[in-house]
Amino acid sequence: MTQKRHYHPLAALRFLRKTVLLCLLPLANALLEFSLSALLTALRQDAALLLFLCGASWVLLEASSWALDDAGVLRLRWAFAAKQERILRGEALAALTIERPLLFRLMGASRVVLYPVGQPAKRAVTLYLYKEDAQELADRLMPICDPVCHRPAGGERAAMVLLGANGLSTLALLYLAIRQSRPFPLTAEALALSRLNVLVRFAAHWLPAGAAWMLVLAGTLFGASLGRSFAQTIHYTVWHTADQLGSRGGWLSRFEFRVRSREVSYADVRFSPTARLMKRWPVFVVAGSCRPELPLFVYRSGQEALFRELLPEFRMPPDIRPSLAHRSAVFFAPAGIPFGLCLLLVLVSRTVLPALTVTLLIPTAVSAIFLAGGLMGWLREGIWLREGRFTLRRQKGVYLHCICVLHPDVCLRTLQSPWAARYQRLTLTLALPGQVRLKVRSIPMQDAEPCLAAVEQKT
């Protein structure tokens, strides 16, 4: 057995993150008294409390250790107050990820997440290790033998186009916000409002500008997220071996993903309006409770050979539409309600506060896009059995997920309301290892019967 090793000091951040709210209690008392002496007392109490928490974090860090023996058995030990030990074998892992954000890279640390077979996400093991220890642990638990590497080039261009479009839209919102912030001449409606009180005049002047600046903030945050995704597509490599799939890449933040081929629960090809325009389709792979944030790879039209090489057992759902007779309108509710509210506010603002109308049109348009996604789900969502495998389409937001279930352990659950039973429809839920659920809504009974029969034959 190898000697026991300690975690990286960044592991103490997990404890501090959960207890940092305790430091706000003295400040809350100072806020109630609202005096300088109370504030100084609260700051001294916060400093003492923070020192105590740092000391407790150091004790926890010293009391925790891990060891990996020659047989590939990982032992995690905690010896604070009570001794605990958890044992993990490499064969019992469905997937693992190695993440190195910029802060971790500067401090020589890595975050390793281990996903045991069949366990839910809350049972995943997160370790903060030194860079060399993390790489050694991954190579010992899930060794890579004779990998075949590919560098698909579809992800960078798709991320760049989205980032450019977001930049242009954010600039347009910024121009609108600056224009709304300028003093504008009072119309007859605004003049009538100005005679009420100062608060109404303030709202009539600054409410349009405030709403516009909120949209600018939302666009900026979304752009930062797209920029992060673009940085992660740099130096992107996907590989496969006889028993594993994986990917690695990133520029400022590095990541690596490894999954056992036999433990892949399903593969998911996501169709979105942007993907259809660029003809580049992201493919996500889920193994147990491991749901990576980034796709395994992005392929474009004409690269189906790469798809078949990486996922030879994948089958696309058939290009047919399910029966739409008496189908539920549940697909339109998540986006239809915000769209109706935004549209109502637009109509009201035209007579009450015209300066706010243009700003309100933007969330209305966004809600309309999501409503179009709901229409796509209403038209296309369904489940089919192809070559003994469950294939399904399900809609979520603006994405249409084309899924092929690859794991043999599948449970089905049906749900029927009285209205659905009258029209021979039901909602079918697929349960996969790791407490993963896939729901297909309002499908005809005749489409679900072959799937139920296939599960009964397996049992």
Region annotations inferred by a language model:
Residues 1-459:
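N-terminal basic, Ser/Thr-rich segments that initiate or prime the first beta/alpha elements at protein or domain
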